[in-house]
């Protein structure tokens, strides 16, 4: 970004903020509000009571930070829902599978998992096998095609939708 600034080229950031340089315009979903919506959907899916896990995105990224803040703030309004484990899975499906497998060994009685994106949620669903959607609810984020299919198939309780085409159009 700094190189673009030095060349007097306008910079428009879409979906993620820049950590250095100056951005002329920033277009993104409200990830904090989305995180709160995810917390409410998760709590509702488990009858507002139980232990849950959180799969975090890339450490320090604006999306992970904001979605995590929204979820933490939102889940605080549900005192009988407790986050018992959380770990980064870097917005990656395979890491979501592996991290979920490890967290479930330490916390076998969880009722739900919030993943800060659909890719990690889909990895969690793979780790859960037949328990996904039945015994353990999964909430994703992004509203990807695969995520929406998992909701339709009953494997994912919800995904927080984004509209990337609209974000791109606004950026242009």
Label for each model-derived stretch:
Residues 1-172:
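A residue-level marker of the well-folded mature domains of exported/periplasmic proteins
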């Amino acid at each position: 970004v700094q190189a673009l600034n030095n060349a007097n080229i306008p910079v428009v950031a879409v979906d993620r903020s820049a950590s250095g340089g100056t951005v002329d315009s920033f277009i993104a979903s409200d990830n904090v509000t989305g995180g709160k919506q995810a917390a409410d959907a998760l709590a509702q899916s488990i009858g507002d009571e139980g232990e849950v896990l959180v799969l975090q995105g890339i450490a320090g990224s604006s999306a992970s930070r904001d979605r995590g803040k929204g979820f933490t703030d939102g889940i605080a309004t549900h005192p009988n829902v407790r986050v018992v484990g959380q770990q980064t899975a870097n917005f990656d499906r395979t890491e979501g599978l592996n991290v979920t497998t490890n967290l479930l060994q330490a916390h076998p009685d969880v009722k739900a998992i919030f993943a800060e994106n659909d890719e990690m949620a889909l990895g969690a669903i793979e780790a859960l096998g037949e328990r996904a959607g039945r015994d353990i609810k999964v909430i994703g984020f992004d509203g990807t095609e695969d995520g929406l299919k998992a909701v339709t198939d009953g494997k994912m309780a919800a995904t927080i939708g984004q509209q990337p085409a609209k974000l791109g159009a606004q950026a242009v």
